[in-house]
């Protein structure tokens, strides 16, 4: 089971404890052997970072910048160095929480639909991982009173349009019950790939798979053309830049939704 056209690109800055948990999960669950390239880009790279990769995680090659470029430029620099057509992007605190068969099934589903031009980007954070971390998901499910009973169910009405995709984290049959905003695109071994317009599926730096060229073109459109001074509080980073003025929601990109493979470390 090999997906040579996919390259893993990680972005890391500090928190080597979380990075090591993530790297260990990728190797133990077979991800690093399944893809064609493994690369990690360090913001503010340190000797300890380099030593850890070169001594303990030799399936990865590394690059880095001596200063903190910010998440946006870190993403761009890392993805530029990917040696494959498609990029599975991961920040250092996302742990793989799936077995080898599930990993292959979901990655291959995404890969083949990217190849066919059916979708532009696919989310790979486990949707169920949002239920306790996303305000939208918690509001969607409904407010719970002191006795543990739901006293209101807000659903789509209580959620901004750009976050309607979060319904997949809350409702088991969300895709089937909301065919006006999403469609069943493909299926493999009962794993379904859904497609939504980006109007209803906001951008996130959480794990995603897309074409390397598509991402770099997107980055250029939102201002990441040539790096000057490192990002700071007056220079918004990727997630903020792409959401500024509702830019992402005004595009015609198609977002793929899967059950997901990665969970965010607490």
Label the predicted regions.
Residues 5-7, 37:
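Cell-envelope/extracellular polymer assembly enzymes that use nucleotide-activated donors
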Residues 26-63:
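Acidic donor-binding segment of Leloir-type glycosyltransferases
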Residues 66-81:
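Glycine-rich, basic loop-to-helix element that forms the pyrophosphate-binding segment
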């Amino acid at each position: 089971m090999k997906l040579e056209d996919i390259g893993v690109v990680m972005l890391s800055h500090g928190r080597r404890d979380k990075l090591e948990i993530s790297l260990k999960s990728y190797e133990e669950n077979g991800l690093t052997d399944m893809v064609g390239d493994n690369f990690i880009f360090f913001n503010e790279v340190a000797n300890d970072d380099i030593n850890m990769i070169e001594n303990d995680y030799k399936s990865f090659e590394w690059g880095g910048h001596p200063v903190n470029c910010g998440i946006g430029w870190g993403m761009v620099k890392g993805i530029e160095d990917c040696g494959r057509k498609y990029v599975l992007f991961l920040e250092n605190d996302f742990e793989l929480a799936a077995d080898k068969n599930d990993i292959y099934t979901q990655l291959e589903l995404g890969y083949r639909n990217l190849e066919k031009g059916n979708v532009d980007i696919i989310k790979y954070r486990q949707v169920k991982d949002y239920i306790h971390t996303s305000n939208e998901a918690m509001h969607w499910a409904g407010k719970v009173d002191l006795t543990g009973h739901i006293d209101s169910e807000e659903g789509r009405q209580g959620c901004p349009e750009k976050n309607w995709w979060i319904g997949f984290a809350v409702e088991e049959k969300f895709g089937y019950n909301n065919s006006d905003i999403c469609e069943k695109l493909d299926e493999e071994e009962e794993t379904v790939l859904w497609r939504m317009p980006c109007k209803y599926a906001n951008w996130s730096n959480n794990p995603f798979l897309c074409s390397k060229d598509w991402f770099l073109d997107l980055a250029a459109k939102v201002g990441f053309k040539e790096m000057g001074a490192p990002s700071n509080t007056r220079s918004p980073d990727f997630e903020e830049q792409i959401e500024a003025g509702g830019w992402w929601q005004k595009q015609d990109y198609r977002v793929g939704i899967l059950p997901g493979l990665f969970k965010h470390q607490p």
